[in-house]
Amino acid sequence: MDKVKKPVLTEKTIRLLEKKQYSFDVDLKSNKTEVKHWIEKFFNVEVRAMNSHRPPGKKKYAGSIVTHSVRYKRMIITLKPGYSIPLFPNE
């Protein structure tokens, strides 16, 4: 499961959990097909839709040189009815 790095838990993503939408940080070079395959195989669920976006990297200053931190890709995954992903141990 090297393409999917970690689940994202923010206020917005917790609201999306009610709609069966889960948010994950994934490898920058991965595409929707690869991530869909990994999610379906690892969690034994069926994916209905996927949306992806790349949040901007943060600037780092080293004297007069400006670099950007490592960027990542975030996927919002919508599951078919009847499926869920246990993100918390009590689920």
From Swiss-Prot:
Keywords (A to Z) from UniProt: Chloroplast, Plastid, Ribonucleoprotein, Ribosomal protein, RNA-binding, rRNA-binding
Signal sequence bounds: none
rRNA-binding found in the keyword field: yes
Cellular localization per UniProt: Plastid, Chloroplast
Cross-referenced Gene3D superfamilies: 3.30.70.330
One of the Pfam families matching this protein, by short name: Ribosomal_L23
GO biological process, one term: translation
GO molecular function, one term: structural constituent of ribosome
Chief subcellular location: plastid
PROSITE patterns: RIBOSOMAL_L23 (PS00050)
GO terms for cellular component: chloroplast; ribonucleoprotein complex; ribosome
Protein family (similarity comment): Belongs to the universal ribosomal protein uL23 family.
Assembly notes: Part of the 50S ribosomal subunit.
Function description: Binds to 23S rRNA.
Annotated protein name in UniProt: Large ribosomal subunit protein uL23c
